C-alpha cells in the first residue's frame, strides 16, 4: 500500500470510527452538560418532553445520510427503498393513531406544517381567523410579526375577560361578519377543552375550512384524554414532540382526499425539499410507542398531574388562568405574589425548576416581562413523577416565589433558592434518566 493510500485509509478509519468526544470535545462537552441539566432539573416547559432511547437511536441513525425528495414510491433519487419503508410505517402508524385517512409526516417543524396548510388552502390576502397570541394562540396563527400575519388578512378571536374561556358566540359573530376562508382552532396556552364540533358548525355556516392545530394536545388526543378534532376538522396539524413524546417535527392529517393532494404538493415541492428521514424514523418509533396501552396511562397521568399541580399552587395563594386546567398545562398569574414572569422564570431556574414566562390574557406587562408563567407536566410525567411529586413541586415553586416576593429584586432570595435547588436535586435523583443513577 502506498504512503498516500495508507494515509487515506487512516483518515477514513478515523472518520468512521472516532467518537464525538475525540473529534469535537467542545460540542461533546456542551451535550454532556445539557444531559446533566436535564437530569438534575425539573422540566416544566409545557412544550418540552423527553424522548425514549429508541427514538434517540432512530434519530441518530445513518438515515441522516439519505436524500429522499418526493414521497414513497415517487422519489427523485435512487436508493430509497429502505427509507420508503420508514416513511410508510410512519404514515400508517400516524393514521392508525389518530383514525385519519391521510397523513403527511414530512414537515420539519410546527411552523412549516401550518405554512404548508396555508399554502395549500389560501391565497395571499385571504382572510382567516385564529386565536389571539395574548389569549393563548401561536405566532403562526396570525401574529403581525409572523408570515401568517403579514401575508393574510387575520381576524383574531380571544377569551372572555371575566373567566378567560373561549367565547364561542363571539367566534361565530366574527365569522359571520368577516366571512373567513379558514378558521384555525387550537393554541399554545389554553388549558381547557376545545369544542371542535361547535367550531365546525361555525365554519360550515360561513363556508370556511376548519383547521385545527393540536400541537400541544396531540398526545392527550392519542391517549384518549381530550376529544379528537380529526372527525370535525378539514385538516389537522400537530408537532410530533410535546405531549406526543416524539422527535421535534410536524405532521398534517386529513380525511379529505382532495385536501390531502393539495397538502402533499404544498409540503413538497411547495415548501420543503428533501425530508429529514432520520427524524421521520424517530416519528415512526414515537407513533408505535403511542399506540401501546401504556401511553393511554401516560396521557391520563399527565392530566391528573397537571390538575394536582394547579390545585397545589392555588392553595399557596396563586391564581390559575381560567381557574384550572383540563389538559397538560396551566398559566399561573403571578400578581398575587407581586412577581413578574421574567423574575419568576429566572428565580425558578436558579432553583433548578425550568419554565417559561408567558403573557396572561389582558396582561398589563410587556411581552418580555409578563405577569405569568406557563407550566406543563408532560416531561415530569415521562420521568415518572406522580401526583405526590407534583404536589411537592407546587410547594417548591411557591417557596421560591414567596422568597422572591420578600427579596423584591431581580436577584431573588439566594438562601431560599439554594434550599429548593437541593430539594429538587434530591427529587430528580429518585427518577433517573437513560439508566443514569445519581
UniProtKB/Swiss-Prot annotation:
List of residues that carry N6-(pyridoxal phosphate)lysine:
242
Pathway the protein contributes to:
One-carbon metabolism; tetrahydrofolate interconversion; Amino-acid biosynthesis; glycine biosynthesis; glycine from L-serine: step 1/1
From the Swiss-Prot or TrEMBL record, state where the protein is found: Cytoplasm
The family database entries (InterPro entries) matched by this protein are listed as:
PyrdxlP-dep_Trfase, PyrdxlP-dep_Trfase_major, PyrdxlP-dep_Trfase_small, Ser_HO-MeTrfase, Ser_HO-MeTrfase-like, Ser_HO-MeTrfase_PLP_BS, SHMT-like_dom
Highest taxon above the source species: Bacteria
The protein's annotated catalytic reaction(s) are:
(6R)-5,10-methylene-5,6,7,8-tetrahydrofolate + glycine + H2O = (6S)-5,6,7,8-tetrahydrofolate + L-serine
Q: Which cofactor does it need?
A: pyridoxal 5'-phosphate
User: Which positions does UniProt annotate for (6S)-5,6,7,8-tetrahydrofolate binding?
Assistant: 133, 137-139
Q: Which keywords does the record carry? A: Amino-acid biosynthesis, Cytoplasm, One-carbon metabolism, Pyridoxal phosphate, Transferase
Site positions for Plays an important role in substrate specificity: 241
One GO cellular-component annotation of the UniProt record comes to: cytosol
Q: Name one GO biological process term.
A: tetrahydrofolate interconversion
Q: What is its EC number?
A: 2.1.2.1
Main location group = cytoplasm
Q: Report the function annotation for this chain.
A: Catalyzes the reversible interconversion of serine and glycine with tetrahydrofolate (THF) serving as the one-carbon carrier. This reaction serves as the major source of one-carbon groups required for the biosynthesis of purines, thymidylate, methionine, and other important biomolecules. Also exhibits THF-independent aldolase activity toward beta-hydroxyamino acids, producing glycine and aldehydes, via a retro-aldol mechanism.
**PANTHER family given in the database record:** SERINE HYDROXYMETHYLTRANSFERASE (PTHR11680), SERINE HYDROXYMETHYLTRANSFERASE 1 (PTHR11680:SF35)
What is the protein's quaternary organization? Homodimer.
Q: Which family does it belong to?
A: Belongs to the SHMT family.
The protein's name is Serine hydroxymethyltransferase
